[in-house]
């Protein structure tokens, strides 16, 4: 019979940081390993033998409100933040990162978050050779034949000895009999080798290696937690017996290419951090451009692996490094290439582009300026991912008139036109992504419209061309002629006209822009804006995303502002029109009224479309639009608060990959110190409960709560100490902590991971049921609604890797020393 557990009272039900303690099987995880937290993933963990057992006579963990009456000024105060190195184990996870020293486990300390930090292995010189030459494991010494998915001849075996460093062993694992990683194979797989860690420095352990034994412990056919335990308890010197599939035979050859007008004429993908094939950091050829040097030579093929270019090695390098090496070559280029075995020689069997990355066209710097580029799917910053490829050059497009047939859709024909003055012609200036013109693929920016359904537009005015297109019916036959040079001159003229128009008074009306008495200010956008979806623009609009900084150079008009975007590199030259605060709020309130009218049967709060508004019934809705900001210099590393699904995986990876840049703080507690604990290392032990309650009332804590009659909390001072040491303090807290840190002048970087859908969540965590995925999604939507204006940025992605790359980029951009903070200026 299951032991009874006292129900927890969570002070922030929306985030429920204590949910991990709400089932019998997870009591031991409440203050210990928090690699994957249940408020993110809603999955139960199997009962572990080590989990504390409670009976009816033994009270379970209880989280109760602290000094209820005296804490009225503190909203949603709950929980506490473990300061551990984001625990070096993932008991309830599919994947574990061994990124910290082996811990000392004390029987009496389930609530101690500091336990995993204790390192029983002194960092003194070790006389034993840490990295001996590879040896082949005598598989006859194993109790039984290794689990083999394939024949014995397909595999090779190696013994690897690693010395556990300050950042642990430096690799991640997945698998086990309870959580097979690949199909039904129960093996323990290496899923990640962390740069800079012990495994990476040794250089022999590879992604997809299978661990057979850790020291003398057999980890074949064991549960995930048993493998974790074996690695944790292995000591400072860890001997790993691993199995890996033998590399397919490759033929290495040298290819000499002479650059032509189209450069080398091929595209690449892959590299460290942007693997084209999971587990493989190689640089692969993904496209041979017709007519280019590689195509004419005929030897380079899709699927070939680039080993070197001239004297520059391309093995184990980033995508950006490979791009630079290929760009900086002379006219004669020598490529060292590995040809795969015959099974891959046919293009239909080429290694799949698993990551859907966009490879770089090597020689796009040689091509003339292109006006053909269509809107590309979003990609990560160039530092973390490949840049988009250029698929076609101007020379490939005919300059002769061509016939294009479009079928009008809900978005019209899906393109914008400009021109029509003094017989200059009508040009396509923009093609809407996903619209009929885009899907057709035969029209492009820079096309001149010759006729529409037989109506000659060569001498038409703008109004005549617009009328012809509007009245053309559902099926529209267009004759277009590509004229990039004419359009280029025309675009320069448009820019000059736009500047004149933006700085002068335009005729009054609903689309007017009054520009008398210019007013300048800086704002942070609290919503996404797509100019193509705003029909009332009086002039060229300016796209922006949530969190972007905008320099509003003219805010004198009630409806429209003129603005430029501000990036980390400075202010962008392009100026455009954006909706004013008043216009945004007016349109959003009108939309919300329509939503409510059409959704009366829905219960309050159930509508995910209400994300932009806040407020109580009977009051005018508070709509997020812009926040006034000013630039400020900081001399500390900003704390980092990540909220939303998968946040714990991201937190763990940040500390694992960059232990010198990210850290965690020491919490406070009123619990008596145990013999093995050190004040200031494991906890700050507060002398009296009364003292800590006073500190809470005086807002010295960003979050606090009670466990087993003892108070736990994270103080502002603890966070400040980490920040002033030059490390970003990773905080596992609620959104309320963002506001408290801002008040304390410790401006955190708040990042919200916004799931695209329930399916998106389930794809990133395949253990979730649909119901659990739905709950996780609903929690994320409520989280966004509650704290949206406090987020520095919002990230979305199809994979965890994509999200992680975005988070790293945001933290880098927002690290300072100059940051934008909320100002008191009135909008």
Curated annotation (Swiss-Prot):
Membrane topology, record value: Peripheral membrane protein
InterPro entries in alphabetical order: DLG1-4_PDZ_assoc (IPR019583), DLG1-like (IPR016313), DLG1_PEST_dom (IPR019590), GK/Ca_channel_bsu (IPR008145), Guanylate_kin-like_dom (IPR008144), Guanylate_kinase_CS (IPR020590), P-loop_NTPase (IPR027417), PDZ (IPR001478)
Domain Guanylate kinase-like stretches: 637-812
Location of the SH3 domain: 518-588
Region feature (Disordered): 38-61, 102-133, 595-618
Keywords, in A-Z order: Membrane, Repeat, SH3 domain
Keyword Phosphoprotein: no
Any one GO cellular component localisation term in the record: neuron projection
Biased segments, Polar residues type: 44-56
Xref: CDD domains: GMPK, PDZ1_Dlg1-2-4-like, PDZ2_Dlg1-2-4-like, PDZ3_Dlg1-2-4-like, SH3_DLG1
UniProt similarity note: Belongs to the MAGUK family.
The protein's name: Discs large homolog 1-like protein
Species of origin: Danio rerio (Zebrafish)
């Amino acid at each position: 019979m299951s032991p009874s557990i006292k129900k927890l009272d969570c002070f922030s039900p929306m985030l429920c940081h204590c949910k991990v303690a709400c089932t019998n099987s997870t009591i031991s995880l409440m203050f210990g390993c928090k690699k994957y937290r249940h408020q993110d993933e809603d999955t139960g963990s199997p009962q572990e033998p080590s989990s504390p057992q409670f009976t009816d006579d033994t009270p379970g963990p209880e989280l109760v409100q602290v000094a209820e009456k005296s804490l009225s000024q503190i909203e949603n105060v709950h929980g506490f933040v473990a300061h551990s190195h984001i625990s070096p184990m993932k008991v309830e996870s599919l994947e574990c990162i061994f990124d910290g020293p082996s811990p000392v486990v004390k029987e009496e300390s389930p609530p101690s978050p500091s336990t995993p930090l204790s390192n029983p292995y002194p960092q003194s010189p070790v006389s034993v050779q840490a990295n001996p030459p590879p040896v082949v494991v005598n598989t006859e010494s194993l109790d039984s034949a290794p689990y083999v998915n394939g024949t014995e001849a397909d595999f090779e075996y190696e013994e690897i000895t690693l010395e556990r460093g300050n950042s642990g062993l430096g690799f991640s694992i997945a698998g086990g009999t309870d959580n097979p990683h690949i199909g039904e194979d129960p093996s323990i797989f290496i899923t990640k080798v962390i740069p800079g860690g012990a495994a990476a420095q040794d250089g022999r352990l590879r992604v997809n290696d299978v661990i057979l034994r850790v020291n003398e412990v057999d980890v074949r056919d064991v549960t995930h937690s048993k493998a974790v335990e074996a690695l944790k308890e292995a000591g400072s010197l860890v001997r790993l017996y691993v199995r890996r599939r033998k590399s397919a035979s490759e033929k290495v050859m040298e290819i000499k290419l002479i650059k032509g007008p189209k450069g080398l004429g091929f595209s690449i993908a892959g590299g460290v951090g942007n693997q084209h094939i999971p587990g493989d950091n190689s640089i692969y050829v993904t496209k041979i451009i017709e007519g280019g040097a590689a195509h004419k030579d005929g030897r380079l093929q899709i699927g070939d692996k680039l080993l070197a270019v001239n004297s520059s090695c391309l093995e184990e390098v980033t995508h950006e490094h490979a791009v630079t090496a290929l760009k900086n070559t002379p006219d004669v280029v020598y490529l060292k290439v590995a040809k795969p075995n015959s099974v891959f020689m046919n293009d239909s069997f080429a290694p799949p582009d698993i990551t859907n990355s966009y490879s770089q066209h090597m020689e796009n710097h040689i091509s003339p300026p292109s006006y053909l580029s269509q809107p590309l799917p979003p990609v990560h910053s160039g530092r973390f991912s490949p840049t988009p490829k250029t698929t076609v050059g101007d020379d490939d497009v005919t300059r002769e008139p061509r016939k294009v047939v479009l079928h009008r859709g809900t978005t019209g024909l899906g393109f914008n036109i400009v021109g029509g003055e003094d017989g200059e012609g009508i040009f396509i200036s923009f093609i809407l992504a996903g619209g009929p013109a885009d899907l057709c693929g035969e029209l492009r920016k820079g096309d001149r419209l010759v006729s529409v359904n037989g109506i000659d537009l060569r001498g038409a005015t703008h109004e005549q061309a617009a009328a012809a297109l509007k009245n053309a019916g559902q099926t529209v036959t267009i004759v277009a002629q590509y004229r990039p040079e004419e359009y280029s001159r025309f675009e320069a003229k448009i820019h000059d006209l736009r500047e004149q128009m933006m700085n002068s008074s335009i005729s009054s009306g609903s689309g007017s822009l009054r520009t008398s008495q210019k007013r300048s200010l800086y704002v942070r956008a609290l919503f996404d804006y797509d100019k193509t979806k705003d029909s009332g623009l009086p002039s060229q609009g300016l796209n922006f995303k949530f969190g972007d900084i905008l320099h509003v150079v003219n805010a004198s008009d009630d409806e429209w502002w003129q603005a430029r975007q501000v990036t980390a590199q400075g202010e962008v030259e392009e100026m455009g029109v954006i909706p004013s605060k008043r216009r945004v709020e007016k349109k959003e309130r009108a939309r919300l009224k329509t939503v409510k009218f059409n959704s009366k049967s829905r219960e309050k709060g159930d509508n995910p479309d209400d994300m932009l508004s806040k407020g109580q019934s009977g009051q005018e809705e508070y709509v997020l639009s812009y926040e006034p900001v000013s630039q400020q210099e900081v001399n500390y590393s900003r704390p980092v608060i990540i909220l939303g699904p998968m946040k714990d995986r991201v937190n763990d990876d940040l500390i694992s990959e960059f232990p010198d840049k990210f850290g965690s703080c020491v919490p406070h507690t009123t619990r008596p110190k145990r013999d093995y604990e050190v004040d200031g290392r494991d906890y700050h032990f507060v002398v009296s409960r009364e003292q800590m309650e006073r500190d809470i009332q005086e807002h010295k804590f960003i979050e606090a709560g009670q466990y087993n009659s003892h108070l736990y909390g994270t103080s502002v001072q603890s966070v400040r100490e980490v920040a002033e040491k030059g490390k970003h303090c990773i905080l596992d807290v609620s959104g309320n902590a963002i506001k408290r840190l801002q008040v304390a002048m410790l401006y955190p970087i708040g990042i919200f991971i916004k799931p695209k859908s329930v399916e998106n969540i389930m794809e990133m965590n395949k253990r979730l049921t649909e119901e659990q995925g739905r709950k996780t999604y609903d929690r994320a939507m409520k989280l966004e609604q509650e704290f949206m204006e406090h987020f520095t940025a919002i990230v979305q992605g199809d994979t965890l890797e994509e999200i992680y790359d975005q988070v790293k980029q945001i933290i880098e951009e927002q690290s300072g020393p100059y940051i934008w903070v909320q100002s008191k200026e009135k909008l």
